[in-house]
Amino acid sequence: MTKLNLTHIEECMDDYDLFLFDLWGVIIEGGETYPGVVEALNKIIAKKEVIFLSNAPRPDFIVARNLRNWGVLDATPPMVITSGDVARQLIVDYRKSSLNDQIPKIFHLGSDRNDDILLEIDYLAINNINEADILLLSVFRDEHEDIHEFDEFLKGKIL
């Protein structure tokens, strides 16, 4: 792989047709975009194909809206691929292939801020994990949180 000696990404715009950007840690950190990133993205989007990648449990339309709110003016859902989109598609596929198109019963273990992963999907939210067709995990724990928080809850559950 060739090492690029760039001071600004715009210097290599003519060398590539497609730009893939991870969001967290590349475009944004701690709720703030990095300096100069929005301006550079808008210039690249005007001339090249751009795809944004994220491990966020969010639908593409939510992330595209966030990008526009940050100033990335032409961000659209087809430009975004998230782990949330993958999960959403798997739920839809499972409903068709394994549930005879019946509405899936989903037990979602995750924080309230991740509830948008299920926006615009027909499902039944249930509180009993043993009755679930699908166990959706979108919980996040950083190094300051207890990773064993759910051990007791999950003990003895049918998984």
Locations of regions flagged by a protein language model:
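HAD-like aspartate-dependent phosphatase fold
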Residues: M1-L159
